[in-house]
Amino acid sequence: MENFNELLQKYADFIVRVGVNPQPGQTLIINCPLEGAPLARLCVRSAYEAGARDVQVNWQDDAVTRIRMELGSEDALTDHKGWQLRRYLDYAESEGGVCVLHLIADDPELFAGLDGAKISRVNSANRSFMQPWREYTMNDRVQWSIAALPAEPWAKKMFPELDTAAAIEAQWKLIFDTCRVTGGDPVGEWQKHLDRLNELGAKMNALDLESVHFESANGTDLTVGLAEQAVWESAGSKNEKGVPFLPNIPTEEVFTAPHKDKVDGIVYGTKPYVFNGQLIKNFHVTFKDGKVVEHGADEGADLLGQLLDTDEGARHIGEVALVPASSPINRSGKLFYNTLFDENAACHIAFGDSYPGTTVGGTGLSKEELAARGMNHSSLHEDVMIGAEDSEITGKCRDGRTVPLFENGVWVL
């Protein structure tokens, strides 16, 4: 690819300076697959140049992860040690604090053919063990960001007609394009984009909505009641000290918290979804009083059931997000088989935990106070795509008005 090194440097600088935004004296932890070493090295340098006190890199390898899941005993895989959690909490509680950058290149079918029930139990135990740290990120107490890079299994899944080298190059180009890196001024392009998302969020909040209704020709007919004092958020976030960061790169969504007991109707998935390294395709779920009461899928139905059975909160939703069909990711015409991208190609809901920041003052409330507002709690938060090219979305205001939000899959607000 022409000027690849220049684009990679721009991408690294953007991920660090705008995405995770380490502050002087702060430690940055980078979680990265082995394939991402060139990008990680650029991020390490950029972070130090931004004033980071220290940069720690945790290397990961999908092949080893699969072997451990296949051959390791469940007891061993869930035998957690205190240091695995403390290495995050110790930095978070230190004077300078911590921020975390996740560089991902997940194989969409990493665990294909393995025992799905075992995978679900192991991953559930891992989430529960790391819950104290997860609360730091779910509450935006620290900066965190997720960005992607190509790897052979993922690239070949997206571009099966190409050889490996060409598939990886095509994937890099797509990542650079959808992350707005290929222009002359990525930061300026992103600022315009974030301003537009913030404007939409402000308009949604001004409507004082009670619920939103989704309808499309595939059979979706879903009403999502909103949590009390729900706040529509957009791409950018701030940590507890007011430091801005960008959790997801790319991002196209405006989102809020549903009321966990006020979701009713049926919804059909519009894109495959990867859960525990396996695919769920053409799913549907039916809600009554906020809870999933029936579900199915053409592929991965058992896997969907395992997701929903994770805990009580997994059968309720913690997020509803609006994304137009005109988003650059959807316009690319490619299915990414990766939630970071696919959730930004279509409207989506998330089974599981609510973000406390999507209700007024939520990051300062107790779990009981959040629950009283209708916020959901779960050990997981899994986004599934429900937006279609013909999606019609209307909002019902608390004063009784009905307002069109989307027509034919795009914003009309």
Predicted regions and their residues:
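Short polybasic amphipathic segments
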Residues: 211-214, 283-286, 389-398
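Active-site bordering "gate/hinge" segments
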Residues: 1-264, 401, 411-413
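Short, glycine-/Ser/Thr-/acidic-enriched flexible segments
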Residues: 35-36, 106-108, 151, 219, ...
